[in-house]
Amino acid sequence: WALPISTARLDVYWFDDHGGVRLPKACRLKYWDGSAFVDLPGASGLGLEENRFNTTTFPEITTTSLRFEFDGNGDSSTGILEWRVYDSGKSPNFPPTVSTGVDRAVVQPGETWLNGSVKDDGKPRPAPAVKWSKASGPGKVSFANASVPETTARFSAAGNYVLKLTADDGQSNASSEVHVSVVARPPMPPLSPVWTTPYQVSSPFWRPRLKNLIVNWIPHCVQQCEDPEVKEGGIGNFVQAARKLAGQPGAKHTGAVFANTWVYNTLESMCIAQMLDPQGDAEIAAAQASQRRTIEDWVTKMLSAQEPDGYILTQYTIEGQRRWSNKHDHEDFQAGHFIEAAIAHHVMSGGKDPRMFDAAKRLADCWVRNIGPAPKRAWYPGHQEMEMALVKLARYVEQTDGPGAGTAYIDLAKFLLDSRKDGDEYDQSHAPVTRQYEAVGHAVRALYSYAGMADVAMETGDTDYQSAVQSLWNSVVNKKYYVTGGIGSGETSEGFGKEFSLPNNSYCESCANCGQLHFQTRLQMTWRDGRHMDLAEETLFNAILGGVDLDAQNYTYTNPLDSSAQRYKWHVCPCCVGIIPRTLLSLPTWTYTKGKDAIYVNQFAGSTVTVDNVAGTSVQLTQTTDYPWNGKVELEVNPATSKTFALNIRVPNRQTSLLYTNTPGIDGLLSLAVNGKSVKPMIERGYAILDRTWKAGDTVEWELPLAVQRVVADHRIVANRGRVALRYGPLIYNFESVDQDVNAVLASSASLAAEWKPDLLGGVLVIKGRFADGKPLLAIPNYARLNRGGRSVVWMKDR
């Protein structure tokens, strides 16, 4: 304490999980007598009992510090859940404690909910006076009520503001500040996604990875889903549900209530895999042919398990459970994945096979009839995903069925989000979504929720949604983001920790990393800002791509930055097994977005993709590049008819997060030419804009600067103090124990160079140099980590 307090009583509540944390063997209390910590005299009742407060009394003392010492019990850890110290009545008056909450963003003309708090000791009066004020900022701030801690504020002008909350108890005062970034509304209308329709890949980087997913990983997932001995459950649950619907006895469900999920994801992956042109590759063609037969078999079985009103969830059907009775049963989550698989199936068929698509509409319509404002049922999901799927369905049916066909699905998505309140941080139901400004809780749920919010914000233009989404983006990217693009420290249950708490034994669940890609892509569609695709690229090339090994024979649920754990074939919760391939095989969707008269080139991959409905025509785009190993890219533009539109080419900024600083700085373009003639385009929001009339055969060539960069973390990230990481373009690099001592020191003066190694890890650009002790170092791309055993780390000591 800053001032001496008087006390004669304290309580302690021990943490005991009957596992790794147990009650202590013994404990002692000490206090600071002015020169040393001494035993607390006459303490009585100091207990070691679980599930209660252990109260201790003693003769009154005056001190500035108390110390609690305890001895561990065997090999178990020991901890305290809560420790209370009681004022005996003679302590001095302490200033109030004031908190203003987290920094946030506001999209005009929206408002921000200020959730300040004030704690006081009740001296000299029961409650202090409080006041909100503007400390700085370019415009006027209007508070709904400046005299209460929780209120709202609006801003007359865009810019950066600092708001102050002050509490005064009559003798002393204290204050706290919150930073608010106020921005203008995003441009309207938002951009549109590019569906993954038939495409080619020539990239020497991407083609073998996509091939291995199709030839190795997806067949493995199919085998697991079809094996009746796999305890997690699979396609057999749909057969059992169909038996129950047909009135046949003995139907039995296998696995968790959410066991339909990985079957839907695997079906979706198979459908998207059909979009890749095998280009004469017999292995790809054979795998695709086999998967087409599986698709037909699975679709028939899934449709047989759909109830007459459109509802589908096999365990509920088999066991007769009541719908919408337990938000933790993943009803919405699985429905969302069914819808997304159905859309992929419809796209795969070129719109010629409507069975799954019609089933998805029946399922969504079932939810629309039952869930919503009174007199319908109030409801929100325990695991978000359906919100994204409903908006995706809405956008798709607007194309297939006409304008207005998707309105009910957007309304339902917004209702599910708006209903989140009075719950827990774990599933982001602790506050209304429009008042959530910090990324908290389970990371997959969070990123799916935030992506769904971004979708709803795009479709409705709701500024409170936009403000919350921008605030959450800042929290994720600038406070809780791993240098690999991974999300979720795992300090809470598979989720986010405190700001700047980013230990390297991180969780970074593969599903959460895929959610981050969805989130950033939606923000790019909202703001047309290249920084979101800089982040998407970072996550794609590192956190997601490293989720499977090079041969796509094994995968990993988590992606720590310091680990010796090998990937594996399956998991007790195989939620990621289909998410990874459906994400990576959707490469065209991450590569391009479009506007009415514009195409955005967001990623660089040797490929041929057709973008439809731009300036009234379709445009075939063929990229030729060896990126990320080489920065040269050639793009051939082939519109079906000559049209005027803007081609927006992302100019990467490797400085993606305020948490990390890269040196040397490497940004911009080295060159840009149209049809062989050098041009200097306008660069706006991270895009080089080429607005002209395009005809078939036009070419654009550009070169991106690529070089080795050192990365240093913000000093508030304790785990990385005195450490350095390396990157090359979008790739973060790892040091592996099979090549060197991963506890060696990489001096700041060490010379580093990139070198191509065609025979290592399928062909990679390594970083070479020497450690401070003169021994050679070798760093490999993060995505290729742990393919040779041993330990693999991102951050090395630099002193």
PLM regions and their residue ranges:
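Solvent-exposed loop segments of extracellular immunoglobulin-like
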Residues: 124-131
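Low-complexity "stalk/linker" and mucin-like segments enriched in Ser/Thr/Pro/Ala/Gly
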Residues: 133-148, 680-681
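Long, well-ordered core segments of solenoidal/helical folds
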Residues: 209-249, 293-311, 358-374, 411-429, ...
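A short beta-strand segment in extracellular, disulfide-stabilized domains
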Residues: 110-120
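C-terminal beta-rich recognition modules with glycine/proline-rich loops and embedded aromatic residues
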Residues: 469, 534-542, 547-639, 659-674, ...
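Aromatic, loop-rich ligand-recognition surfaces of beta-strand-rich domains
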Residues: 1-92, 380
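Proline-centered linker/hinge motifs at extracellular inter-domain junctions
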Residues: 93-97
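Aromatic (Trp/Tyr) and acidic
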Residues: 186-289, 322-350, 384-408, 436-474, ...
